[in-house]
A protein has these predicted regions:
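Alpha-helical scaffold segments in soluble metabolic enzymes
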Residues: 11, 15, 148, 152, ...
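C-terminal active-site/capping subdomain that shapes the small-molecule cofactor and substrate pocket
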Residues: 235-325
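A general secondary-structure junction signal
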Residues: 166-168, 221, 265
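C-terminal substrate-binding/catalytic lobe of Rossmann-fold NAD(P)-dependent dehydrogenases
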Residues: 196-263
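Conserved active-site and cofactor/substrate-binding residues in soluble primary-metabolism enzymes
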Residues: 7, 117, 141-148, 195-203, ...
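Short beta-strand or tight-loop elements
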Residues: 118, 215, 277-279
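A generic structural signal for well-ordered coil/turn residues at beta-strand boundaries
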Residues: 132, 228-230, 275-277
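N-terminal Rossmann-like NAD(P) cofactor-binding subdomain of oxidoreductases
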Residues: 1-188, 193-195, 285-287, 322-324
Length: 325
């Protein structure tokens, strides 16, 4: 587990530690080496010391989860792949397929020779490819919720235009010193941010287009006064009139056999998905005919760490739900 001292890395380490079929061989940190993980995160109860990642001491390692910041992950991912190690990357370094789009939003890529080689890790959409993958790009939290909310419509080529208002807790900022997420700034408060453009928008557009609906997306994220949880509200204009009953039937059929995506009879809430790998979806049609689709997830679970383990299970030929129920 590379980068185990951040929120998503620490949680991934805890899930692997408790996993019935995996052994956590090492947990590394660039900033907290020498400290114990169970001292940094007592509630995860992972009694292991954090060390510096030594790429020359990886004998017997089958897989790695990398939880470094965007831009910093790619060189480490490349080094691990050179050694034949399966990699689940939690950063954005391998999510986008177009190099110009990546450069616009993230800058120069740290491993251009690997760009475009990762399988996008939205498990419910790419399950077959993930079973054969050697490098998985775990989706961003906002794209996870938003694309799952819209996928049944996108797969039918129904989306014409999409507006998304998404809200999440402060853990989405990571272990940030930004005073925006200090308790005194966030308590009894909520606000939009990056209103003129967020880097998850092109990721959402990429995946909707790949499913069959190259629709323009307007995306505005909001910050909520809670630590974990994310709610995505998606307003979709369809290319042709479709009844509410037909749309709900489409969602029920698409997700009926999914172990972690549940289609609800009413709007979802964040408390129900906290500390789970679940995504709760609800879809309806408002009076003017526009579809409104909702998805609730825990942003550091299904939006990052547990989805990474869900994909790792598939890569290793394990039960997809192992360690996650």
């Amino acid at each position: 587990m590379a980068g185990a001292s951040g929120y998503t890395g620490a949680l991934a380490a805890q899930i692997v530690w408790d996993h019935p079929d995996l052994e956590l061989a090492a947990a590394t940190s660039r900033s907290d080496a020498g400290k114990r993980l169970d001292r940094l995160y007592p509630r995860y109860r992972v009694p292991i010391g954090l060390s510096v990642l030594d790429l020359d001491r990886l004998d017997g390692i089958d897989a790695a989860i990398v939880a470094y910041p965007h831009g910093a992950a790619a060189p480490t991912v490349a080094a691990l792949r050179e050694r034949g190690i399966l990699v689940v990357d939690l950063s954005a370094d391998f999510r986008l397929r177009d190099p110009d789009t990546y450069a616009r939003w993230y800058g120069e890529h740290g491993a251009p020779e690997l760009f475009g080689t990762g399988v996008y890790g939205l498990t419910e959409l790419y399950r077959d490819q993930l079973r054969e993958a050697t490098l998985v790009a775990t989706p961003g939290c906002y794209p996870t919720a938003s694309v799952l909310a819209l996928a049944p419509l996108a797969e039918q080529g129904l989306l014409s235009e999409v507006f998304i208002a998404a809200m999440q807790g402060t853990s989405g900022y990571g272990r940030s010193s930004d005073d925006t997420v200090h308790f005194s700034a966030m308590t009894e408060n909520a606000f939009p941010y990056k209103t003129e453009g967020h880097r998850h928008r092109p990721e959402i557009e990429q995946e909707l287009a790949a499913l069959g609906s190259p629709a323009p997306v307007t995306f505005v994220p909001h910050l909520l006064p809670l630590d974990q949880g994310e709610l995505s509200t998606c307003f979709a204009t369809l290319g042709e009139p479709t009844s509410k009953e037909a749309i709900r039937s489409l969602y029920a059929k698409r997700y009926g056999d999914e172990p972690f995506v549940h289609v609800l009879d009413g709007p979802p809430n964040l408390r129900a998905v906290r500390d789970t790998n679940e995504c709760h979806v609800y879809v309806t049609v408002e009076e003017r005919g526009r579809v409104v689709a909702f998805a609730a997830i825990d942003n550091i679970w299904k939006g990052a760490s547990s989805q990474g383990v869900q994909n790792l299970n598939l890569m290793l030929g394990l039960d997809e739900t192992a360690g996650l129920l």
